[in-house]
Amino acid sequence: MPKRVDRAARREEILDAAVRVFARKGFAATRIEDVAVEAGIAKGSVYLYFDSRDALLTGAFDSYITRSGQVLAELGTGTALDRLTRLVHGTIGLLADHPDHARVLLDVWAANPPFDLAAMYREYRSAIADLLRQAQSDGELRSGIDERHAAVIIGAIEGCLVQALVDPQVSLRDLAGPVAQVCVEGIRR
């Protein structure tokens, strides 16, 4: 009797293998065959799930964006600034837990990635801007803070990410507290 394959699990295994190879070799230098070898399957098996490298990259980031959405969904209750602090910690934790995804993101940033990177940024900016508006409404923010500061907060997180990726002496996870402190206390009334 032929071995039954859990298609969803196999798909995730292939995506995980693709992210590892993309992070190690770069997206442009990666071939489908490289992903197959990393996943321990035949090249043709990859094509049963994904028709191209772009589809692999898109699938990997769809999975990552789902996890990112969970961070936003799990902010809980409390003041808007408490939730902003949890958002910073959660986002940095996610990036620290998935450094290969972060490496691939940096690799494809300047290129024209096959997924909607702008949509991911809009979602995060919108979530942060909502928290800033709520904090402003509750009298928690000093004057002059507005939705533009959402992009600055994202920039602070990404700046730390870049440093952690290029310098092994920098621990991204250890920067969560300082980033949250600067981003939240720097805008608090």
Language-model segments: residues:
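C-terminal peripheral helix-coil segments that are non-catalytic and often amphipathic
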Residues: 1, 86, 93-97, 125-137, ...
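Key DNA-contact positions within bacterial/archaeal DNA-binding proteins
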Residues: 44
